[in-house]
């Protein structure tokens, strides 16, 4: 049986943080911004294609599917940017606005990567595999409901949620690719 860990990608999160922070501070500075969403799409697509290459040859990867998932996040980013414009306009006199913008960019990066990760798992990985094991970061910031899931194997069709689905979630999946009927039966017995 093949088991692949799709661990949380801190490098992708950092790239997203830099994108959101830069966007927020450009809005804050009052400069007219022309956001390059292609760089955002590239971050998302490179992330998920590199994950999919763990179990599939590059020539068999449907990049269009990755692009569709990235487009959802870009739409969400545009909504965030519009809301941010309004928020900054209403709060530009506050002393702690820069700190709030930085914190928002950090949360936004983690949340957007989690949303993208969730969509990648549900729309691409679940089509190739039946099962995944829930993993947490194992630190004090893991919420109790996710800690209770740590190490539990789920069937994609029966899982209430998947890693990354809830706001700020940093959990990740170990995906099972059983190769024989016996391996599937073994998972089902422990499921």
Question: What are these language model-derived features?
Answer:
Residues 153, 158-159:
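Betabetaalpha-Me/HNH-type nuclease active-site subdomain
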Residues 126-153:
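Aromatic/histidine-rich interaction motifs
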Residues 137-139, 176-179:
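Generic structural motif
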Residues 1-120, 124-130, 177-191:
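N-terminal leader/targeting and assembly helices and adjacent pre-domain segments
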Residues 146, 159-178:
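C-terminal edge-of-domain segments
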């Amino acid at each position: 049986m093949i088991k692949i860990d799709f661990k949380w990608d801190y490098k992708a999160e950092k790239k997203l943080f830099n994108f959101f922070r830069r966007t927020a501070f450009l809005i804050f500075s009052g400069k007219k911004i022309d956001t390059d969403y292609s760089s955002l799409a590239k971050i998302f697509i490179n992330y998920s294609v590199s994950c999919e290459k763990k179990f599939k040859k590059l020539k068999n990867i449907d990049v269009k599917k990755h692009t569709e998932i990235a487009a959802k996040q870009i739409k969400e980013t545009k909504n965030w940017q519009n809301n941010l414009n309004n928020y900054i306009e209403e709060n530009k006199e506050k002393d702690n606005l820069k700190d709030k913008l930085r914190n928002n960019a950090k949360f936004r990066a983690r949340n957007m990567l989690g949303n993208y990760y969730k969509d990648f798992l549900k729309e691409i990985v679940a089509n190739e595999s039946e099962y995944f094991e829930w993993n947490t970061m194992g630190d004090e910031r893991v919420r109790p409901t996710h800690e209770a899931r740590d190490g539990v194997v789920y069937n994609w069709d029966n899982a209430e949620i998947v890693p990354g689905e809830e706001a700020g979630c940093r959990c990740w999946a170990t995906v099972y690719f059983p190769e024989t009927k016996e391996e599937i039966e073994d998972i089902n017995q422990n499921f």
